[in-house]
C-alpha cells in the first residue's frame, strides 16, 4: 500500500479525538487575532492551551531540521506556509493562516485556518474564500476507489478557474501516530492517477493558493516559505478519514459545526 497505514477502529476513535482537540484550539485562538497582537503572543497562547488545557503537546516545537523553534505556524500575507511567530504586530487588513498540530497519547491532530485582522480588502477575502472552496472540492472527491489524483485535480480546478495558482512544492500528508505519514497529497493532478483511496486512510487536504504565480522561495531561517512575486497566499487544512461510503472531516470546528 505504498507505506500508507490503514487505521484500526480504535485508532480512528483516537484520531477523531485529536481532530476535535486541534479544532477546539483553533476556535480558542481566533479571538486573539486582532491588530496590535504579535504572532509570538499567539504562539505562547497556543502552547499554553495545548499543554495546560488539553493535556497534549505542540508537535511543531523542535520538529525537523533545523528544529522548528515555535509551537505553531503563523503565515501572514505573502507567506505561503511555515511562518515562524515573531514580535511583529499584526495590522489592520492582514490575512493570516494559523496552523496547529497537537500530539497526545501518541497521536496527532493537524488543522489550519485563515483569519482576517480587522477589515480586509475584497481582493484578500476572495482569495481566502476560493482557497476554502478549493480544499472542500478536494475533500468532496474523497471516497473508496477514488484516487489522490482526483483530489488534487478537484483542488486545482477551483483555484485555477478563479485565476489563482496552486503551490506544487508543498502538499498534504497522511497522519496518525506520525505527524507526517504516507501518502503525499498533492493539490494538483490528473483524475485517476496516484494511490487508490481505501477506508481507514487518514490524511490532510491543505491547498496553498497564491494570488499571483505559484513560484516560491524559502527564507534563510530554513522554514518560512514566501511567494516569489510577493503576492498574497492563503491556505486551509482539514484532516479527512476515508469511510466505507465517502469521507469524514475530523477537524470540524466544534464552535460552528462548519468545516
Feature locations, PLM:
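Active-site neighborhoods and metal-handling regions in enzymes and metal-associated proteins
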Residues: 1-259
